[in-house]
Amino acid sequence: MSARVVDARGLEPPEPFERAMEGLMALGKDEEMLLILDRMPHPLLRILDRDGYVHTEAFRDDGAVEIRIRQR
């Protein structure tokens, strides 16, 4: 499975959310998106759940959050 990387660290809201949504819209059936953010995006996680995406979250050693997202 190929991964589309969206690194939105260091951006001011709402740009990280907008980049995440753009990445989701471009996500193919057999692709995974790796989203890297400065903080846990709780509103985005609710949208992912509502829209049926599979996602996992992990904190990196540098404090950033990695979210792996794919279509169900």
Role assignments for model-derived ranges:
Residues 1-28:
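An N-terminal amphipathic alpha-helical segment
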Residues 5, 34, 66-68:
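Beta-strand secondary-structure signal
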Residues 12, 41, 61-63:
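Residues that cap or initiate secondary-structure elements
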Residues 26, 46, 58-60:
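Sterically constrained small-residue positions within well-ordered secondary structures
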Residues 34-54:
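Short, structured protein-protein interaction patches enriched in aromatics and acidic/basic residues
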Residues 52-72:
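C-terminal edge-of-domain segments
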